[in-house]
Amino acid sequence: MMKMQQFDSNFYSYFNIYLEIKTTITEKKSNGKSILNDFLSQISNNLQISQLSGKSEYEAYETASQEYCKTVMSNNFVLSHYFRTFYRLATLALSAPIGDEVGKMKYVKIIRSQLTEEELLVLYYNSHSRYAGQSRQLLYEYNILKHLSPLH
C-alpha cells in the first residue's frame, strides 16, 4: 500500500513536469504557431519539396526519415527535452508496483489522454528515426499512438 502511494506521488509529480514542458512547446507564440506546429510545418514543407509521389514506399519512408533527421539537426532540436521527459514518464508508468499489465495501462492511458494530434504525429516521426532508441517498441507495445489520425 505504501509503495503504491509513493509511486502515485512520484508519477503525478513527474506528470506535472511533463505538462509544463508540453505547454512550452504547444503554447502559441506571437506568430500564432507553437514550437511544435513550426517543427511539423518545416517537416511537411521539406517533404513536399522532396516530391514523394514518384517514389516507392520504401524510398518515400527513407526520404521522410531523412527529412525528419535534417529538421531535427537544423533546429538544434528544441524538442529533445520534451521527448526525454515523455519517454521517462512512460517508462515510469510501466514500472508501477502493480502485478498486472491492466493496472499499468491505467497510467499509460492517463498519459495518452493528454496527447494532442501534433504530439502524436511528432512521436510517430521520432519513432521511425535513428533517434528512436527503445521508444518505437514502447509506443507500439502500449498502443500510445492509438488516436493518431490516419490522415497524416
Label the model's feature ranges.
Residues 2-152:
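Intrinsically disordered, low-complexity polar regions and short flexible loop motifs
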